[in-house]
């Protein structure tokens, strides 16, 4: 079948099961081929082909609302709703988004990217439906990994209490990105082998009612003691106790079983949870056999061999530099522990776990819990290293404020994927952390210019015992600089001069330092002498350095790959105003006040005007022509 000709999912209703099975194979072949060129979330989507087709066959999108938790498993949904022809632009600048996007299609009713939000949003939609007295189905699809998130459990509690009509699809593939952890995961494991409780209960009730004269009374009594029946028939009754009708487990790759179960769910009043067992990566051997999460999301790959197509890497990944330094320090300090919220692979903590299995804690998709747990460990003299993506640290903001900073606890936060991350787009760009951390009392915030300085700042963080300290580091690889054999402490709040200059100064840090250095070099050749400052401590700033710099009364340009509002440049301006430098000429370059979409980092930097050319032009506008040398 030519998938690019699909306009909407209505054609599915006229297809036989054998035709749907052929369609499943066509979609898998399409995904494997297309994603081999663009990269993307291949394994999650291969696992939900039959489930997605079954949902679109039995329900009527967009009237009926599908909410894809996290959203990376929505590719099949996109194909069935007329977007197959756009897949060669997947996750590229101005191309097809890798997550549901309301502006892309009327079938995308809820945008996602972070986990565990679908149930709360679905509850909102269901309540709105009931108030408006309409009759659409609301169907959140949530994975067993996302179900470990506290927000999902809060929503389950509320939905079950209100007895709201809703069909929750639990897509259980035993993995989020890496293998799942936690007691709830174990409950689901027991349910996978428990059989179909609901049908057994209904069949028993039907048989009892057939008994002459007393059958109805016996059936009523049986209903009253259904809790006992549940415990006899099912080894885990978690969802039933929350007020849901539990259906399953059902094979998520068997159309007959899916249709039977979903039809039953459609007829059931109140909240229903359909437990669907799927195989992540199904149909492509390299992805299907992956047990650690390598094939969750990938770049381009060779279909035949399963080898990834990567540029030759001459420098280590930033995540590896940080985690390897922590691992080395853990060998000499038994107080060091590493904590991750379900990202051991992305944060490069596999080697740490192999060497220190009892000192590496994966809490699952539970950023709030991870953060406060780290605080609790710090109260007992441990040295927790919390490795967390910038975009996911947003989810634990109150815990950083209330539990870590307020108590001034020695927690080292590794803020991975800081800055622009590219293809994952708006929901994953790490551009807000400076603004939401800089104003917090007690915290130290750093970002290195290269991986050698990075290892020294990790060492500095582990030696620091005066409160919380955080290190930002970007996605991707370092610069390939030589690495010192010995670690050293970099004094807190100190900056360094990377290039001397007398006519203007560029103050920046991290990923924008190469841009600043190149701009200063070009300006120098044009007769403009520009100082470049490595502001590696975003907080506290180097006040002595700033006093000296502001005292020279030369134009200052701050650059940051982070949002301007509340950012580092704002801090420099605040310092100048508070200390009476009212004539100082300070301008800022950074991320403007809108969400940055998906695309390559290079293309996104061009869009927002954060390039070497733009820096050169800005410095020229800041320096009066009469001050420039010929």
Swiss-Prot record:
The keyword Transferase is assigned to this record: yes
Question: What is the UniProt remark on how the cofactor binds and its stoichiometry?
Answer: Binds 1 Mg(2+) ion per subunit. Binds 1 thiamine pyrophosphate per subunit.
Entry GO CC: cytosol
Catalyses: D-glyceraldehyde 3-phosphate + pyruvate + H(+) = 1-deoxy-D-xylulose 5-phosphate + CO2
Q: Mind listing the GO molecular function terms for this protein?
A: 1-deoxy-D-xylulose-5-phosphate synthase activity; magnesium ion binding; thiamine pyrophosphate binding
GO terms, biological process: 1-deoxy-D-xylulose 5-phosphate biosynthetic process; isopentenyl diphosphate biosynthetic process, methylerythritol 4-phosphate pathway; terpenoid biosynthetic process; thiamine biosynthetic process
Q: Which residues of the sequence carry a binding annotation for Mg(2+)?
A: 144, 173
Q: Which cofactor does it need?
A: Mg(2+); thiamine diphosphate
TM regions (residue ranges): none
Enzyme Commission code: 2.2.1.7
Is this entry keyworded Cell division? Answer: no
Q: By its UniProt entry, which CDD domains does this protein fall under? A: TPP_DXS, TPP_PYR_DXS_TK_like
Enzymatic class:
transferase
Write out the function statement from the record.
Catalyzes the acyloin condensation reaction between C atoms 2 and 3 of pyruvate and glyceraldehyde 3-phosphate to yield 1-deoxy-D-xylulose-5-phosphate (DXP).
Put simply, this protein is called: 1-deoxy-D-xylulose-5-phosphate synthase
Q: Which gene encodes it?
A: dxs
């Amino acid at each position: 079948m030519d998938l690019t000709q699909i306009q909407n999912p209505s054609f599915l209703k006229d297809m036989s099961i054998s035709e749907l099975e052929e369609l499943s194979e066509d979609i898998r072949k399409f995904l494997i081929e297309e994603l081999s060129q663009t990269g993307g979330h291949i394994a999650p989507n291969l696992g939900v082909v039959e489930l997605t087709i079954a949902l679109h066959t039995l329900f009527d999108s967009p009237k009926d609302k599908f909410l894809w938790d996290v959203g990376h498993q929505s590719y099949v949904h996109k194909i069935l709703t007329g977007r197959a022809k756009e897949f060669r632009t997947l996750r590229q600048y101005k191309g097809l988004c890798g997550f549901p996007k309301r502006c892309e299609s009327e079938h995308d009713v809820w945008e996602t990217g972070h986990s565990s939000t679908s149930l709360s949003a679905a509850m909102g939609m269901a309540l709105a439906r009931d108030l408006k007295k309409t009759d659409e189905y609301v169907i959140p699809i949530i994975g067993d990994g996302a179900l470990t998130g506290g927000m999902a459990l809060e929503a389950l509690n509320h939905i079950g209490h209100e007895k709201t009509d809703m069909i929750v699809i639990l897509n259980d593939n035993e993995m989020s990105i890496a293998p799942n952890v936690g007691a709830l995961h174990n409950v689901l494991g027991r349910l996978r082998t428990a059989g179909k409780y609901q049908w057994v209960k209904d069949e028993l009730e039907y048989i009892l009612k057939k008994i002459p004269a007393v059958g109805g009374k016996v059936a009523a009594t049986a209903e009253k003691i259904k809790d006992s029946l549940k415990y006899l028939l099912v080894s885990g009754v978690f969802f039933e106790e929350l007020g849901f009708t539990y259906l399953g487990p059902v094979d998520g790759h068997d159309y007959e079983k899916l249709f039977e179960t979903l039809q039953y769910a459609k007829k059931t009043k109140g909240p229903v949870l359909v437990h669907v067992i799927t195989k992540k990566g199904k149909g492509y051997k390299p992805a299907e056999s992956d047990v650690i999460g390598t094939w969750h999301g990938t770049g381009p790959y060779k279909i035949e061999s399963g080898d990834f197509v990567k540029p030759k890497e001459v420098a280590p990944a930033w995540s590896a530099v940080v985690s390897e330094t922590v691992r080395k320090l853990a060998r000499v300090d038994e107080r060091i522990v590493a904590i991750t919220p379900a990202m051991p692979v992305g944060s490069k903590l596999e080697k740490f776990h192999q060497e220190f299995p009892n000192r590496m804690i994966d809490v699952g998709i539970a950023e709030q819990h991870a953060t406060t747990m780290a605080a609790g460990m710090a109260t007992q003299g441990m040295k927790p290293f919390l490795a967390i993506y910038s975009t996911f640290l947003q989810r634990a903001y109150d815990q950083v404020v209330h539990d870590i900073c307020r108590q001034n606890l020695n927690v080292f936060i590794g803020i991975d994927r800081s800055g622009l991350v590219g293809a994952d787009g708006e929901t994953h760009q790490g551009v807000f952390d400076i603004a939401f951390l800089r104003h917090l009392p007690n915290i130290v915030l750093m970002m290195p210019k290269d991986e050698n300085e990075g290892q020294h700042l990790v060492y500095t963080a582990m030696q620091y015992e005066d409160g919380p300290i955080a290190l930002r580091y970007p996605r991707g690889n370092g610069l390939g600089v030589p690495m010192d054999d010995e670690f050293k402490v970099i004094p807190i709040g100190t900056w360094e001069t990377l290039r001397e200059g007398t006519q203007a100064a560029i103050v920046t840090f991290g990923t924008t330092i190469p841009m600043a250095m190149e701009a200063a070099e070009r300006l120098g050749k044009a007769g403009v002498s520009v100082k470049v400052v490595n502001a590696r401590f975003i907080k506290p700033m180097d006040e002595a350095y700033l006093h000296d710099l502001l005292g020279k009364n030369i134009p200052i340009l701050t650059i940051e790959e982070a949002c301007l509002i509340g950012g580092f440049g704002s801090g420099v301006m605040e310092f100048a105003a508070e200390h009476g430098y009212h004539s100082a000429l300070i301008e800022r370059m950074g991320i403007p006040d809108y969400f940055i979409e998906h695309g390559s980092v290079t293309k996104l930097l061009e869009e927002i005007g954060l390039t070497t050319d733009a820096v050169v032009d800005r410095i020229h506008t800041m320096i009066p022509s009469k001050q420039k040398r010929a």
